[in-house]
């Protein structure tokens, strides 16, 4: 271990106590106000998140989105969009705009178990046109 002249880790505490610089008088009941809360992470339905992906606070992941492995997501991801990288950027849409709109209206994830079971082959095999045709009355 090397220590620079500005930081002698052998003689003093190395923790910087950031909470106490500006909020020393803060009551324990208000401790979360010391940090900038960017909001909850909201993950839609039918989303796939790759291994070790990081999603930052306040980000919304749209229905049907795919997050690549080890992506760092700092901004909202639109529905049925594939993103990857650091920071995550759009790679492409999973479907054309019309199909995306129909899938968002279809909301198959809200169906009963029996309804999903009947359409499972279409969903699992990626037969989106057949799924939409079979369920036109829902659109």
Model-identified regions with their sequence ranges:
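Single conserved hydrophobic/aromatic residue that forms the stacking wall/gate
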Residues: 1-6, 10
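C-terminal segments of enzyme domains that contribute to small-molecule binding surfaces
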Residues: 14-55, 87-139
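Activation loop
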Residues: 5-6, 39, 69, 99
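Left-handed beta-helix
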Residues: 39, 44-45, 50-51, 56-57, ...
């Amino acid at each position: 271990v090397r220590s620079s002249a500005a930081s002698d880790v052998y003689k003093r505490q190395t923790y910087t106590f950031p909470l106490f610089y500006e909020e020393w008088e803060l009551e324990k009941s208000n401790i979360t106000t010391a940090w900038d809360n960017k909001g909850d992470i909201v993950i839609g339905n039918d989303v796939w998140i790759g291994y070790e992906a990081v999603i930052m606070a306040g980000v919304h992941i749209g229905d049907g989105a795919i997050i690549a492995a080890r992506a760092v997501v700092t901004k909202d991801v639109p529905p049925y969009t594939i993103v990857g990288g650091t920071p995550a950027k759009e790679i492409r849409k999973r479907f054309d705009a019309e199909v995306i709109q129909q899938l968002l209206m279809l909301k198959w994830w809200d169906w009963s178990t029996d309804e999903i079971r009947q359409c499972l082959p279409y969903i699992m095999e990626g037969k989106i046109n057949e799924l939409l045709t079979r369920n036109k009355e829902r659109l």
